A protein has these predicted regions:
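Alpha-helical segment proximal to the catalytic Tyr-Lys
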Residues: 125, 167-168, 235
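Short C-terminal tail/terminal secondary-structure segment
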Residues: 143, 227, 238-251
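Substrate-binding pocket helix/loop in short-chain dehydrogenase/reductase
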Residues: 96-97, 101-109, 207
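Active-site helix of classical SDR
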Residues: 120, 154, 162
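Residue(s) in the substrate-gating loop at a strand-loop-helix junction
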Residues: 138
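Short, small/polar-rich loop/turn modules that mediate ligand/substrate recognition or access, typified
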Residues: 170, 175, 237-239
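Conserved glycine-rich cofactor-binding loop
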Residues: 9, 16-18
Length: 251
């Protein structure tokens, strides 16, 4: 059976854990050469070892424009082009309105909005016509979530990027889409509950109770959706948002 990404050059930002790592593994399994980025060298080395020989790790902070420039220069030198760009780096923390501070706002929007914007902008000269750009959103962007307003607003911005950039890039046939996960069992999610294992499990159980399918998702389930959007199977899909959330956003 033919592999869906045979011979493609794929970039996964934030590819050292969770959804990013699972997606990088799937891209490699489907035949792509995968460049993964991360901010910590130890995690990056471990991710490359887990993905296998088709992976290359590049230390880069997506919110730092100088590091993005270096990232793209290296990809230009080593691969010459980008067929698939998965903009996954980001994150956030929970604070109610009265406790939000400037540093939290700047960090969240810096990673999720500024980072996404300039990652795609810097990659434009390397993106082939007809490339697939996939942005990681979140289903909280379309609903109210207590103590999560900054993160939710940042992901609403990401959702609009896909709409607007689809028009900006239509002459090149570049498809820009958003994957919006619901509760997925990743380190980033469980860490919201703090270091206590019982509290982490309580958070997962609470979130599972709000999902029509009755559970939280697995990173590999999001990775499967990313493979679909990256491949020719999604050749007529652009500017859209694919929810991978067990139906949570639909109720």
């Amino acid at each position: 059976m033919a592999r869906k990404l045979e011979g493609k050059i794929a970039i996964v930002t934030g590819g050292t854990t969770g959804i990013g790592l699972a997606t990088a593994k799937r891209f490699a399994t489907e035949g792509a050469r995968v460049f993964v980025t991360g901010r910590r060298q130890g995690e990056l080395d471990a991710a490359v070892a887990a993905i296998g020989p088709r992976a290359t790790g590049i230390k880069a902070d997506s919110a730092n424009l100088n590091e993005l420039n270096r990232l793209c220069e290296r990809i230009k030198t080593e691969a010459g082009r980008i067929d698939v760009l998965f903009v996954n780096a980001g994150g956030g923390s929970m604070l109610p309105l009265g406790s939000i501070i400037e540093e939290q706002y700047d960090d969240t929007f810096g990673r999720n909005v500024k980072g996404a914007l300039f990652t795609v902008q810097k990659a434009l000269p390397l993106l082939v016509d007809g490339a697939s750009v996939i942005l990681t959103g979140s289903n909280v962007s379309i609903k109210g979530t207590p103590a999560f307003s900054v993160y939710s607003a940042s992901k609403a911005a990401v959702r609009n990027f896909a709409r607007s950039w689809t028009l900006d890039l239509k002459s090149r046939g570049i498809r820009v889409n958003v994957i919006s996960p619901g509760p997925i069992k990743t380190p980033g999610l469980v860490d919201l509950a703090g270091p206590d294992a019982a509290q982490q499990q309580s958070l997962l159980d609470t979130m599972a109770s709000t999902v029509p399918l009755g559970r939280v998702g697995d990173p590999d389930e999001v990775a499967g959706a990313a493979v679909f959007l990256a491949s020719s199977d999604a050749s007529f899909i652009a500017g859209t948002e694919l929810f991978v959330d067990g139906g949570q956003a639909q109720i």
